[in-house]
Swiss-Prot record:
One of its GO terms (cellular component) is cytoplasm. Keywords: Cytoplasm, DNA damage, DNA repair, Meiosis, Nucleus. The keyword DNA repair applies. This is Chromosome segregation in meiosis protein 2. The lineage of its organism: Eukaryota, Fungi, Dikarya, Ascomycota, Saccharomycotina.
Length: 214
C-alpha cells in the first residue's frame, strides 16, 4: 500500500491493486485527514470499468462527513484518446486554480490525488482502432503528460499526485521474488511488440513511475 500521508507519497506511484475496501479506506483517509486545518483536498478518479469502490466508501462515511463526496470527481475513459482528453481537462482546471490563488493571494494548501485504474484496458481498446506502434505512442504521450503535470504541481500550495492501479499479475516483474505464472508469460508475449517485452503495467512502472507500492 502507498504511504498513508499525502506528503510521503511519491509524485507518480504504481499500486498493485488491492481489494476495494483498501482503496476505499485509502481515499477516505486522504479526504478526512487534517480535518480542522485549512488544507483543501480533491480526488480525481478515472477508470474504464466503473470500478470506483462506492459501496465500500459508503460504509466508511458517516453523517458528519457526507460532504466528502463533493470532493470526488469520477471520469470514465474507454481508451487512451479519452484518457488524454480527461488529462487535458484536469490540467486546465489546475491552471485555473493556480491563477485564482495568485489573484486572491490564497496560500491555503490544496492537495489533489488522481487515481487511474484500467490503463491496460484502455491500451487494449486503443489497439482496436490503431496499430501497435500508434497505440504505444499514445501511451507514451499520456504518461509524459501525467509526468509533466506532477512535476509542475509538486510543491505547496497546489500539489498533484497520481496513483496508477494495476492487477498484481500485470506487474509481476516489478515485485520482489515473484514466480511468474504461465498466464503471465502468455500475456507478456501477447503484447511483446508493443511493450518491448513488458506488460503495460511493467512498462509504465519501469519508465515513468517514481515508486511501486508493495
Amino acid at each position: 500500500m502507498p504511504p498513508k500521508r499525502y506528503d510521503d507519497l511519491s509524485l507518480l506511484t504504481l499500486w498493485p491493486v488491492a481489494p476495494d475496501i483498501d482503496l476505499a479506506q485509502y481515499i477516505y483517509q486522504f479526504l478526512t485527514s487534517e480535518v480542522g486545518t485549512q488544507t483543501e483536498k480533491e480526488v480525481y478518479f478515472t477508470d474504464s470499468i466503473n470500478s470506483f469502490p462506492i459501496h465500500q466508501l459508503q460504509e466508511l462515511v458517516n453523517e458528519s462527513n457526507q460532504s466528502i463526496y463533493e470532493n470526488i470527481k469520477i471520469n470514465t475513459a474507454l481508451d487512451l484518446h479519452e484518457l488524454s482528453s480527461i488529462i487535458k481537462k484536469n490540467t486546465e482546471s489546475l491552471i485555473l486554480k493556480k491563477i485564482q490563488n495568485k489573484k486572491t493571494n490564497d496560500l491555503k494548501p490544496f492537495q489533489i490525488l488522481s487515481v487511474i485504474n484500467g490503463l491496460d484496458v484502455m491500451f487494449r481498446s486503443t489497439l482496436v482502432s490503431f496499430t501497435n506502434e500508434q497505440a504505444h505512442l499514445m501511451l507514451r504521450d499520456v504518461m509524459l503528460r501525467l509526468r509533466q503535470v506532477c512535476n509542475e504541481y509538486d510543491c505547496s500550495p497546489l500539489t498533484f499526485k497520481i496513483i496508477l492501479l494495476f492487477n498484481r499479475s500485470d506487474v509481476m516483474e516489478l515485485l520482489p521474488k515473484q514466480r511468474h505464472s504461465a498466464a503471465h508469460q502468455q500475456k507478456k508475449m501477447k503484447y511483446n511488440n508493443a511493450m518491448e517485452g513488458n506488460s503495460v503495467g511493467e512498462f509504465v512502472g519501469k519508465y515513468y513511475c517514481d515508486e511501486v507500492a508493495q
